[in-house]
Structure formats: structure tokens, C-alpha cells
A protein has these predicted regions:
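Long, low-complexity inter-transmembrane loops of multi-pass membrane transporters
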Residues: 1-20, 24, 199-316, 343, ...
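Hydrophobic core of transmembrane alpha-helices in multi-pass small-molecule transporters
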Residues: 40, 108, 119-135, 319, ...
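Extracytoplasmic gate region of multi-pass secondary transporters
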Residues: 45-56, 296, 301-366, 452
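Intracellular juxtamembrane helix-capping segments at the cytosolic ends
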Residues: 56, 133-148, 155-156, 416-429
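Conserved MFS/SLC helix-loop-helix module at the cytosolic interface between two early adjacent transmembrane helices
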Residues: 80-119
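Helix-to-loop junctions at the C-terminal end of transmembrane segments
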Residues: 81-94, 361-375, 460-461
Length: 511
């Protein structure tokens, strides 16, 4: 087989350039440590709600539905404010936003101890703690995402280990505090512990001061070298004659012209025409100013992402998953105490077993994901199936040994739903849109969680059955599978077709 070689084409010319890349480690490990420290005392409060506030809500005359109202209000605020938190991260920095969030958490837990009715809890735990968790969640993920590229899943998993440590230790701490200091004293001491999160958030330094320098060979534009070799170039003149042929230039002229090749000249006639048809300068300035303002808002909140149907499908799916997991965390301690008839010590043991297995899962499953190059969406689908099966079996058990074993299995599967939630969103958008994408994901959670959380609480109170409530929680994960699996299979088939199309091209180029 013979091929024709274009005489203008030259061999590939390369040059070495210094490129700044994320460290994929380095100070990033300190960022993970700071995030974990903040999660121990703040994010873990989500799973402690029933232990801390359960008896107080009963004294106020409220049952599962009342608890669902408070928890749903917190989820609504923490997620509905996602775009705002993303905008604050862009305008200021992840560190500032995280410190602000830790302060909100401390204030919210402190004042919740003085609650005398459910609306006090909605204001303190729901609103103040919700704002704090919103800021912490968004800013810490953006910071970790900026430090890690290759080992992102492992980094997020390690950072979330702090939440697991809090979920393992804090139930026993809360039980001890409630027995010795009462509800109000417990809230005051928990707020003091929460303030330690500020120290962790201060470790979130900007990635730009820790960027790693690498030397990379890049291919120089071959067209420029082809023109240079043949000594051809367009000469820019003030009043060009369209019928005149472009002259040849020597090499020195060519190099100077190439530097300025982006200049554009227009004829006097076309300039005059533009001047006569241009609108009023003041009107043009005002319109440009308004358009610029709208463009900034458009870019700040990442509105362009909403035009992508796949992105919308992803954020709705992650919102359904988070709602299901969060609602089970609310119901599980009540199920253990009321349906399985366990005491507070046994309940705390089961919750600690969930947290311990969750921590093991966050340390091991991301490593397997990176090793086998599994997409975050596939990991979320597989763990959703795992969680559905385990929870449905668990709902029918009353033996403490079986409940401990199933708690371990559930915690192990639950780990990846937490780790992959934001990674799933960030995988499907550009890096500069990650803060906005995470914010929009939290917004969808804020829209979906309150009505669904209230509905799940109503099912429990109306039927009087924890089995029916847990089955309804699993139904949310079934919806995730129904909406995601067809899209993932379509992408898999499309990818295989593209590979088959490219293979003959590779063989042809080697001939």
C-alpha cells in the first residue's frame, strides 16, 4: 500500500514546557485531616439526631412525624442553599466558607439545647445547623477535588472517615452526657466539641500555593512550521487590494509576522460602514453592562448545567439516594428500641457497628474502584442494590446478634453511597463547574428531601409499621436503578461501538 505525503507537512516538532498540576497528595493530606476533624464533630450530628433529641421531642408531644419535620427542614436548608454555598466558595475561598460553616454548626447546636417546642428545633437544628453543614460539605469537597485528580475516590473516602469515627464514638458520648448532664447540658457540651471543627477547616489552604511543577513535552503547531519552511505568510496592509497576490517573505519577517498573526485589519470602507450603523454609545454601554451582569450570575451558579438531561438525571438520582440513607439513619435507632426492643446500650452498639463497617468500606472500596477503573455511577448502582437487600432483611429481625451482623453489612454498603455522591456529579462536568455542580446537586436534594422525608415519616405513623417505612425507603433506591441503568447501558454500548470504529483506523495508520 502506498501513501502520498504532503510536501508542506513537516515532522512533529516539540518543546519542553513547565506545567503546574495538582499535587495529588502533599498538603492535600492535611486538607483531608482537617476535613475529617470537622466531620467528626459536625457532620456526624446527622446520625445522632434521634439519640440526642428523641426524648425531648416525645416530651414536646411529637413522634416520628415530628422528628421527620425537623430533620427534613435541616436537609432542606443544607441542600437548598447549595448554589449559594458554591457561589460563596467561588467569591471567597473554600477555607473561609468551611470556617463560617463550622461556626454556624456550633451556634445551632448550642441554642438547640434551649428548645421548648418543635419550632425552636426547626430554627436551631434545622436552619442554623443546616447552613453550617451546607457550607462545610460544599467547600471541603471542592478543596479535596482541587488537590486530587488520580486518587480522588480514596481522598474523599479518607476525609469521610472522620464522619465514621464520629458515628462510632459519639453515640456512647451522647449516652453518657444524657445520663449525667441531661438534654440541655448535652447540647452545650456538644456545641463545644463542634467548635473544634474550626481548627480543621483552617487547614484548607488554597491549592495554588501547593501546585506541583512538571516538565512536559508539547507538540508545536505544525501549520506554523509548514508556513515557515515554505516562507509563506499573509502580509497585513492598511488598504489591501483583494486582487493583489500575497508576496513571499524571508524567514526573519516570517517569525515577526507569526508573533502578530492574531491581528485583524479591515478596510476603511468597512470601518466607515460599522461607524454609521453602530447604535448609540450610551445605550450600547447600558445593554453591555446588563448583559455582563447576567452572564456573571449565569456562570456563577452554573446554569448551563441544567441544559444537560444526563446531569439532571444524575442529581435527582443522588438526591433520592441521600434522602433514603438519611431517613434510614433517623428511623434505625427508633426501630432498634421500639420494634426490636433493644436498650440504649445495645442500640448504641448497633449504630457503632454501622459506623465501623462504613469506615472500613470507605477505606477499601475506593481503592478497588480506582484499581479496576469503575465509574462512580456504577459503584453507586451496585451499592444501592446491596443496601436494598440488606435493609429489607434487617427490617424483619429482632435478635440482637443478627442485627449486629446486618448492621455491619449495611454500613459496609452504605459507605460508597456517601463517597461517590459528589464524585458522580463532578465526573460529568468540567473542573471549573464543580462548585456550581455540587451546589445544584445539593439544591435538588433540598427540593426532594423535605416532602419525601415527611411522606416517609407519615407512612411510619399511619401504618404503625417500621417494615413499611423501610420498604418505602428502599423504593427510592429502586427509582434510582430504573432511571440510571438504561442510561448507563446506553453509554456502555456507545463506548463499545466507538472502540470498534477506532480499531480499523489504528490498524490502517500502522500499515
Amino acid at each position: 500500500m502506498t501513501t502520498t505525503i504532503n510536501p508542506l507537512m513537516s515532522p512533529h516538532k516539540t518543546k519542553k514546557v513547565i506545567k503546574l498540576v495538582p499535587p495529588d497528595g502533599g498538603w492535600g493530606w492535611m486538607v483531608i485531616l482537617g476535613t475529617a476533624l470537622s466531620n467528626i464533630f459536625n457532620v456526624s450530628m446527622l446520625s445522632l439526631f434521634s439519640l440526642v433529641y428523641g426524648d425531648a421531642l416525645e416530651a414536646m408531644g411529637h413522634k416520628t412525624q415530628g422528628a421527620a419535620v425537623v430533620l427534613s427542614s435541616m436537609l432542606f436548608v443544607s441542600n437548598f442553599g447549595g448554589p449559594v454555598a458554591g457561589a460563596i466558595v467561588k467569591i471567597t475561598s473554600p477555607r473561609f466558607t468551611a470556617v463560617m460553616g463550622a461556626c454556624f454548626c456550633t451556634v445551632g447546636i448550642f441554642f438547640s439545647g434551649f428548645s421548648t417546642n418543635i419550632w425552636h428545633l426547626v430554627t436551631t437544628y434545622g436552619v442554623l445547623l443546616g447552613i453550617g453543614l451546607d457550607c462545610i460539605s460544599n467547600s471541603t469537597f471542592v478543596s479535596i477535588n482541587s488537590y486530587f485528580k488520580q486518587r480522588k475516590s480514596q481522598a474523599v473516602g479518607l476525609a469521610n472517615v472522620g464522619t465514621n469515627i464520629g458515628q462510632m464514638l459519639m453515640p456512647h458520648v451522647v449516652r453518657y452526657l444524657l445520663e449525667n448532664y441531661g438534654f440541655r447540658g448535652t447540647c452545650l457540651l456538644l456545641s463545644a466539641l463542634s467548635f473544634n471543627g474550626v481548627a480543621g477547616c483552617l487547614l484548607l489552604q488554597p491549592v495554588k500555593i501547593h501546585m506541583k511543577k512538571i516538565i512536559e513535552e508539547v507538540t508545536v503547531d505544525e501549520t506554523i512550521y509548514s508556513l515557515e519552511n515554505e516562507q509563506f505568510h499573509m502580509v497585513v496592509v492598511e488598504r489591501p487590494d483583494l486582487n493583489q497576490e500575497l508576496p513571499k517573505c524571508n524567514k526573519q519577517q516570517t517569525e515577526m509576522q507569526l508573533v502578530n498573526r492574531s491581528k485583524i485589519n479591515v478596510s476603511k470602507e468597512s470601518t466607515d460602514k460599522l461607524e454609521t450603523t453602530s447604535p448609540n454609545k450610551n445605550d450600547s454601554f447600558e445593554e453591555g453592562k446588563e448583559s455582563n451582569w447576567l452572564r456573571k450570575l449565569y456562570d456563577l451558579f452554573g446554569i448551563v448545567l441544567l441544559s444537560d438531561i444526563r446531569f439532571i438525571n444524575i442529581v435527582i438520582g443522588t438526591a433520592l439516594t441521600t434522602t433514603s440513607i438519611a431517613n434510614f439513619s433517623l428511623v434505625y435507632p427508633l426501630f432498634l428500641q421500639n420494634a426490636a426492643s433493644l436498650d440504649k446500650q445495645q442500640t448504641a452498639n448497633c449504630m457503632s457497628a454501622v459506623a465501623a463497617a462504613d469506615m472500613v468500606g470507605r477505606l477499601t472500596l475506593p481503592v478497588l474502584q480506582d484499581k479496576f477503573k469503575i465509574k462512580a455511577r456504577w459503584m453507586l448502582i451496585m451499592t444501592a442494590i446491596w443496601v436494598i437487600v440488606i435493609r429489607q432483611i434487617l427490617a424483619h429481625q429482632t435478635d440482637v446478634t443478627l442485627l449486629l451482623a446486618l448492621s455491619i453489612l449495611y454500613g459496609f454498603g452504605r459507605s460508597m453511597t456517601v463517597v461517590t455522591k459528589n464524585i458522580t456529579i463532578s465526573e460529568n462536568c468540567k473542573s471549573e463547574l464543580v462548585p456550581a455542580a455540587v451546589g445544584l446537586g445539593m439544591l435538588s436534594m433540598g427540593i426532594i428531601a423535605p416532602p419525601l422525608g415527611y411522606f416517609l415519616g407519615w407512612i411510619r405513623d399511619y401504618t404503625g409499621s417500621y417494615i413499611a417505612c423501610i420498604a418505602a425507603q428502599n423504593a427510592l433506591l429502586v427509582i434510582l436503578l430504573v432511571t440510571w441503568l438504561p442510561d448507563m447501558l446506553y453509554l456502555h454500548i456507545k463506548s463499545n461501538k466507538e472502540k470498534k470504529t477506532l480499531d480499523p483506523i489504528k490498524v490502517f495508520t500502522k500499515m
